[in-house]
């Protein structure tokens, strides 16, 4: 016997979270909980403002329609990426497809004073991989900060993310301030320039490896082995169903590319599922999931070791 609940939620964010020039004051989303007999599965639907095609309200309408269809015995998935991902996660838990084993390691997101970062990163146990957002300030400053971190910590590798912020000139200004001897320890730089051709040229000219992120969601993108391209960054909330995520990971691996499962600032429930997906589909590759600290609370399922308060399901607004 099938049954389902849908919950709506809103989590206050830390004051400094800015996405595409918009301050993100709250993270808004939905949960679906599916039951079939004794089995249960959860999924999170949380479109990311400025990045998702769909709004929270559109996702809610699509989710409620899909849940009612599922209760009638239909097995298809919705089209909207965030709804398809959340619904497929709930089904994967319900059927036991999504393994319980998780990779709760996270490449720490580096913000704040560079001198403080050096101290924090130097004390990191094990493999030292960290992420730095670039393109928010002057390119020269970004280059100097990256160079400082790589110089101060000889075993540090950095993942950089520019979100297509730079013109070719700005990208070259950044590279000019990174010692060529350190560039091999830039694991990859996500989408440095506004166009793929400019990003490819940057990689060829500087020897700094790049990764595709936004490109994966463009209609004309195809997976290819290209000079200077080392990785793809897959954000399941923006991608679609678990099957589509699996297809992208498999396509990347077939070309020898690194596939990184990455957060779209999901709640703790969604992040713990992404940690399981990463352990399942990209074992041995550190996922990019260090976003929980941007929020003021957890929900339903806590992230191991987090001190943030965790709301229970009966504290959420139920829609169905």
From Swiss-Prot:
Q: What general EC class does the enzyme of this chain belong to?
A: lyase
Which GO terms fall under molecular function for this chain's record?
magnesium ion binding; O-succinylbenzoate synthase activity
Write down the SMART domains for this protein, in alphabetical order. Answer: MR_MLE
Under catalytic activity, the entry for this protein gives: (1R,6R)-6-hydroxy-2-succinyl-cyclohexa-2,4-diene-1-carboxylate = 2-succinylbenzoate + H2O
Tell me the CDD domains matching this sequence: OSBS
Which residues of the sequence carry a binding annotation for Mg(2+)? 161, 190, 213
The active-site annotation reads 133 (proton donor), 235 (proton acceptor)
* General function of this protein: Converts 2-succinyl-6-hydroxy-2,4-cyclohexadiene-1-carboxylate (SHCHC) to 2-succinylbenzoate (OSB).
* Family to which this protein belongs: Belongs to the mandelate racemase/muconate lactonizing enzyme family. MenC type 1 subfamily.
Q: What is this protein called?
A: o-succinylbenzoate synthase
- From which organism does this entry originate? Salmonella agona (strain SL483)
Q: Which gene encodes it?
A: menC
């Amino acid at each position: 016997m099938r049954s389902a609940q849908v919950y709506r939620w809103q989590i206050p964010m830390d004051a400094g979270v800015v996405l595409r020039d918009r301050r993100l004051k709250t993270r808004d989303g939905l949960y679906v909980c599916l039951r079939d007999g004794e089995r249960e599965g959860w999924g999170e639907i949380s479109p990311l403002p400025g990045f998702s095609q769909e709004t929270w309200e559109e996702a809610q309408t699509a989710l409620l329609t899909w849940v009612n269809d599922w209760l009638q015995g239909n097995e298809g998935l919705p089209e909207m990426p965030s709804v398809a991902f959340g619904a497929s996660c709930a089904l994967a838990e319900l059927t036991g497809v999504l393994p319980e084993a998780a990779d709760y390691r996270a490449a720490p997101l580096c913000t704040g004073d560079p001198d403080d970062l050096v101290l924090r990163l130097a004390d990191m146990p094990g493999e030292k991989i960290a992420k730095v957002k670039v393109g928010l300030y002057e390119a020269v400053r970004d280059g100097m900060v990256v160079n400082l971190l790589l110089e101060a910590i000889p075993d540090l590798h950095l993942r950089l993310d520019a979100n297509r912020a730079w013109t070719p000139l700005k990208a070259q200004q950044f590279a000019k301030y990174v010692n060529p001897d350190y560039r091999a320890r830039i694991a990859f730089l996500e989408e440095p320039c506004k166009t793929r051709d400019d990003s490819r040229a940057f990689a060829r000219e500087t020897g700094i490896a790049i990764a595709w992120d936004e490109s994966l969601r463009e209609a004309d993108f195809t997976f290819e082995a290209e000079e200077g391209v080392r990785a793809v960054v897959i954000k399941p909330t923006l991608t679609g169903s678990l099957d589509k995520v699996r297809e992208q990971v498999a396509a990347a691996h077939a070309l020898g590319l690194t596939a990184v499962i990455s957060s779209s600032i999901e709640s703790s429930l969604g992040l713990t599922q992404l940690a399981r997906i990463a352990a399942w589909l990209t074992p041995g590759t550190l996922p990019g999931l260090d976003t929980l600290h941007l929020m003021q609370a957890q929900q339903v399922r806590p992230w191991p070791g987090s001190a943030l308060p965790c709301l229970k399901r009966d504290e959420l607004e139920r829609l169905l």
